[in-house]
Each structure stands twice: as C-alpha cells, then as structure tokens.
C-alpha cells in the first residue's frame, strides 16, 4: 500500500487562522494531499491522505514549525486517497463543544493514560468509562462496558452528562474518543464541573489499537472514521461484530446515508436490504421524490412502487 492516512491535532496558538488556512491549503494542494483540516486561534485538527512520500513531506513540514514540532501523527496505511477533496477551514474551535466558559486543555485537562493504563481502567469495577463520541460511532464499535451517551453531536455531551450525573458520582471517570482531541477538552470540562478523578486515553482509540501490548483488547466492533473508509479494525486479538442491521437486526458493519437528501441519517444496512428498501431508512424517505438511490440506479416508477411494498412486510413483523 503506497498511501497513508494521517490523523493529528495540536492545541497551540495560531494568531491568524484565516491566513494560516489559506497558506496551508496551498501547501497541501501543491503536495496532492486530500482531507479536512480545521484551524483556529487554539490550534489545528486534521486528517488527510496522500502517498507515503507526500505525507512524509507534510509531517516534516509541520515538525519544522515551532508550534507543531512535537505534534503526534496517527498513521494508517491505505490503498489510495481516503478523501475526495482538500479543505482547510478557519473555525472558532478545532473541536466544537460550544461552551459558554471555554476550556483550554493546555491548562485544564484529565490525566493522560497510556494504552496499558487504560486497559487496567477497563478492568476496574470502580471506574466509569465514558465514550465521548456520537451514538452512531458507538453503535459500530466501542470498548466493552463503556457508557453510550445519547448524542449525535459532540456539543450535546455536556448537557447529557449533567442530566445523567448520578451515574458518575464518587466514581473514577475515564473517557476516550477516536484520536484524543475531543477528550482533551471534554475531560477538562469534567474537572471544571467538579468531577475530581478524571482521566483520558492518550492518543485515543487509534493509538490503543496499534499498541503492541494491548493490541486493541476489549474493543468490540470497528472504529468509525470520518473519511471514505467509514471504519477500521482495532482489536487484533479477537474479531467481534456488534453493529446491527437497521431493518432485520442481523450483525452488520456497513454504514450508508439514507437516500433521502433531506434526511441523510446514517444507518447500518446490508447490501441486500439497501436494495430491498431503496437505500432509505423509512417508507417516507424511500418514496421521497429526490431519493438518491432511485436516481443513481435508474429505477423505473413501476419498480419503485414494487419495492415500496417491502415496507409493508416490515410493519407486519414489527
């Protein structure tokens, strides 16, 4: 495999994010890189793909900058690009928590746990493990015994914690996310909220899965990633599938977006059921006049109406 996917972040001061974004985009395009990078006055958060040579040049370029000299890159090998375009965007935050009183992880953040230390926390009955990701990420894969917050956006996590505070009272709290960036700010917020014993998986799930000692142990399913790959393996010890097909509940790890562009809900669904239910999550979405699955597959009106009757069987067995 001649390509690599990089995942990285750094909380550091960037004085002029707009100018930085413009210059950085030009550099990335000159090196044929593709991906998504967010920059703000608080730092950088990025994931991109390119050939091994070009991604190595990118990492060297970043490490030559005093602000990013010690930035850690999580690296995955890939068959080709994991993104279709290159975006570098200035933002208010590099990860959107939207707090009234913002947290600076450089001053306030939870204790860092190495993969081995985190594995011990997973085995400790007096420790509560909070998944700091969204519900659809959790449903594809998560650490055994972790708590699943009922959220679809990171910014909703603080409110969910406040509503469920009883679950965590007088417990050691450990949190994790994909690459670590969400936990940097979230664990800092937990400390400001009065939680005393707060820790985080340093480097996130991505680092834990590559650790030679832990080998992804106690991870079930796959890890959701925000690129064309959709998911990657983490557990090198045992393979489990925890995702369930939206329609029949069978084991499934295949995510699609609902074919109704006004819905776009992410659902786990087999190829067979995607065909059967017109790529949609519901009857209403399947019959939507702008159904992308119908358009992409040139399905005739007669066939469309015929497949819509498949939803009748669903309701009969519900």
UniProtKB/Swiss-Prot annotation:
Report the record's Gene Ontology biological process terms.
Answer: tRNA modification
Task: Please describe what this protein does.
Answer: Catalyzes oxygen-dependent 5-hydroxyuridine (ho5U) modification at position 34 in tRNAs.
EC number(s) given by UniProt: 1.14.-.-
Report the residue ranges that make up the Rhodanese domain in this protein.
Answer: 123-217
Query: What PANTHER family does the record tag this protein with?
Result: RHODANESE-LIKE DOMAIN-CONTAINING PROTEIN 7-RELATED (PTHR43268:SF3), THIOSULFATE SULFURTRANSFERASE/RHODANESE-LIKE DOMAIN-CONTAINING PROTEIN 2 (PTHR43268)
Q: What is this protein called?
A: tRNA uridine(34) hydroxylase
Do you know which PROSITE patterns this protein is assigned to? RHODANESE_3
Q: Which GO terms describe its molecular function?
A: oxidoreductase activity, acting on paired donors, with incorporation or reduction of molecular oxygen
Keywords, ordered alphabetically: Oxidoreductase, tRNA processing
Q: Per its UniProt record, what Gene3D superfamilies does this chain match? A: 3.30.70.100, Rhodanese-like domain (3.40.250.10)
* Location of the active site: 177 (cysteine persulfide intermediate)
Q: What catalytic activity is recorded?
A: uridine(34) in tRNA + AH2 + O2 = 5-hydroxyuridine(34) in tRNA + A + H2O
Pfam families attached here? Answer: Rhodanese, Rhodanese_C, UPF0176_N
| Protein family according to the UniProt entry | Belongs to the TrhO family.
């Amino acid at each position: 495999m001649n390509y690599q996917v990089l995942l990285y972040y750094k909380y550091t001061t960037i004085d002029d994010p707009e100018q930085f974004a413009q210059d950085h985009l030009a550099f990335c395009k000159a090196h044929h890189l593709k991906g998504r990078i967010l920059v703000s006055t608080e730092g950088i958060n990025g994931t991109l793909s390119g050939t091994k040579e070009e991604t190595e040049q990118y990492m060297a370029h970043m490490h030559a900058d005093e602000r990013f000299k010690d930035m850690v890159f999580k690296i995955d090998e890939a068959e080709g690009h994991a993104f279709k375009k290159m975006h570098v965007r200035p933002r208010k935050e590099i990860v959107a928590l939207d707090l009234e009183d913002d947290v600076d992880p450089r001053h306030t953040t939870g204790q860092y746990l190495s993969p081995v230390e985190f594995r011990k926390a997973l085995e400790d009955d007096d420790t509560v493990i909070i998944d700091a990701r969204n519900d659809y990420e959790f449903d594809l894969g998560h650490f055994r015994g972790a708590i699943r917050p009922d959220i679809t956006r990171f910014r909703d996590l603080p409110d969910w914690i406040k509503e469920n505070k009883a679950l965590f009272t007088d417990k050691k709290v450990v949190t994790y996310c994909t690459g670590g960036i969400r936990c940097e700010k979230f664990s800092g917020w937990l400390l400001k909220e009065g939680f005393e014993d707060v820790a985080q998986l340093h480097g996130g799930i991505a680092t834990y899965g590559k650790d030679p000692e832990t080998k992804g142990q106690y991870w079930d399913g796959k890890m959701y990633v925000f690129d064309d790959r959709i998911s990657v393996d983490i557990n090198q010890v045992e393979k489990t599938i925890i995702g369930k097909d939206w329609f029949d509940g069978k084991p499934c790890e295949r995510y699609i977006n609902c074919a109704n562009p006004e819905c776009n809900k992410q659902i786990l669904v087999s190829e067979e059921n995607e065909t059967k239910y017109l790529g949609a999550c519901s009857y209403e979405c399947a019959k939507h006049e702008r159904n992308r699955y119908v358009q992409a597959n040139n399905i005739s009106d007669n066939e469309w109406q015929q497949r819509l009757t498949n939803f009748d069987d669903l309701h009969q067995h519900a």
